[in-house]
Amino acid sequence: TAEVLVTGRKADRNIEDAQTSVIELEMKTVKELPALLGEADIFRTLQLKPGVASAGEGNSGLYVRGGGPSQNLVLLDNATVYNPGHLLGFFSVFNADAIKSSTLIKGGIPAEYGGRISSVLDMTMREGNMKAYEFEGGIGAISSRITAQGPIIKDKAAFIVSGRFTYLSFLLNPILERQENPVSI
């Protein structure tokens, strides 16, 4: 009599998740890319990715796979942001220094995000440093930014404060004050 031993082995799977059309954006990448007037912008960085376009230089809206900006869902820590652009559409409202992570879902949007047909941009804010105080900032052609973070109670509670300030009011006020009747009817 002969003895036969049969063994089987599952093939090694390199693909663990079938979710496609997802862009994970590192804030380090956003800060390293050349920026319009020296201001790092998450939306401008996303416009460099496949399937995402802009409507021109003066527009920060996301046009994902043919959809318009109103067809995108923008979330910041699970809260909906209804108007993610400012400064006449040149920049998004998000300070890259205060954002921890950013995920753009361009297709196959999960049901939990319902209501938008173009994309979902899900961003998470940074948490403050619980061990040491840190300060960072920058000066650009039209704005400056600063971020401060540190422990309130070491290893238990922390703070982070981040802000941007533009110089455009100083540049435009003298011009606007000279115009006595800027609109003719």
Describe the predicted segments one by one:
Residues 33, 131-134:
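A generic structural signal for short coil/turn motifs at secondary-structure boundaries
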Residues 3-109, 120, 126-127:
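Periplasmic N-terminal accessory/gating domains of Gram-negative outer-membrane beta-barrel systems
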